[in-house]
Regions:
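Acidic/polar, low-complexity extended loops/arms that serve as protein-protein interfaces
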Residues: 23-98, 127
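Sequence/fold signature of self-assembling virion shell proteins
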Residues: 2-55, 60, 149-161, 165, ...
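Ordered core of a single globular domain
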Residues: 168-206
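Non-transmembrane, amphipathic alpha-helical segments
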Residues: 76-78, 113, 281
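Short loop/turn segments at secondary-structure transitions that flank enzyme active sites
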Residues: 92, 127, 195-197, 289-291
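Short coil/turn segments at secondary-structure boundaries
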Residues: 133-138, 185-192, 212
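Helix N-cap / beta->alpha transition motif
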Residues: 89-100, 190-195, 234, 251-254, ...
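Alpha-helical scaffold segments that mediate packing/assembly in large oligomeric complexes
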Residues: 99-176, 302-305
Length: 305
């Protein structure tokens, strides 16, 4: 009886927190902590930008001499519906819950059963979405796809035929940062966890006595000698490729990258329910997702030669 009550509790737990859980599912990817997020995108939405220049002129005489320019540009962000469908056999679920309840009784687990299931699935969705934001090419176009398709995006190569020197990769990425990128504010180097750990290990290996050792567990570090440049690891670049060549770093001002979604629309959902006919507990998440880059010419990508 207790297990049956708990299965009902799973649906109740989700029903009471649908909006909160959907937001956590969609917004939990770490890249979204720093890039621009555009909400309420149903299908397509324009990204409108104005680039203005003014000219100072001699005002010692009368007259009108119009000068300067206002350049309007527009890029479209397009989102696609993404779904997660899962199901669990009610009998198997009850067996698992009984074992899990023993762990709770022994103080080896603290979360209620229904919260544990939802929490683990949220983590899995967040991890999958983190990769999709950068690498997706089927359901929607990830950021690397946008970069590869735009001729104005700067794709630079690094010769890894003799192996990857992470110091060289980061230094090359740093050397490619333009004045326009600096003018936007803080510049971010997005790198894979492998590049991040490799670079920190390399820096720590030559660490002098008066410099603190860098903790590889840090969410980000700054480039030595330039606090304007942040180096940030992302699982989204793990195993990433452009044209079958490894991607080592993507450099830009973080808000130049855009993720579009819609977590409040009626077509989006986060739901768990029990199907008595099939004796299955079903799990559904539905949301929109898509990416775009405001100014591709202000993105530098370092990839394998």
């Amino acid at each position: 009886m207790a297990s049956a009550i708990n299965l009902t509790g799973l649906s109740t737990y989700v029903d009471q927190r649908t909006d909160e859980l959907l937001t956590k599912a969609v917004m939990g990817a770490k890249t979204l902590d720093v890039i621009d997020v555009m909400l309420d995108v149903k299908y397509k939405a324009p990204l409108n930008y104005l680039d203005t220049t003014v000219v100072f002129a001699d005002a010692s005489t009368c007259g009108w001499d119009a000068s300067g320019a206002d350049v309007f540009t527009q890029r479209m962000i397009e989102v696609s519906p993404v779904k997660v469908n899962k199901e669990w056999c009610a009998r198997d679920m009850r067996k698992y819950w009984m074992n899990y309840q023993l762990l709770i009784d022994a103080n080896r687990e603290t979360l209620p059963f229904e919260e544990k299931i939802v929490d683990e699935n949220l983590k899995a969705i967040n991890k999958k979405l983190e990769t999709a934001i950068w690498q997706e090419s089927t359901l929607f176009t990830g950021l690397l796809g946008v970069i590869a398709a735009d001729a104005s995006a700067g794709i630079k190569t690094y010769d890894a035929s003799a192996g990857v020197d992470y110091d060289e990769v980061i230094d090359k990425a740093y050397s490619e940062i333009t004045d326009d990128m600096y003018a936007r504010g803080e510049v971010t180097m997005f790198v894979s966890p492998t590049v991040y750990r490799g670079y920190i290990a390399s820096v720590n290996a030559v660490c002098c006595a008066n410099r603190e050792v860098i903790d590889a567990a840090s969410d980000f570090i700054t480039y030595p000698g330039d606090s304007r440049v942040t180096i940030r690891p992302t699982e989204g670049l793990a195993g990433a490729e452009i044209s079958s060549k490894d991607v080592y770093a993507v450099v830009t001002w973080a808000k130049n990258l855009v993720f579009g979604t819609d977590v409040e629309g009626s077509e989006n959902d986060f739901k768990v329910w029990y199907d008595d006919k099939d004796e299955m507990t079903r799990f559904k998440v539905l949301f929109n997702a898509g990416t775009q880059i405001k100014f591709p010419n202000e993105v530098i990508t370092i990839k394998e030669a």
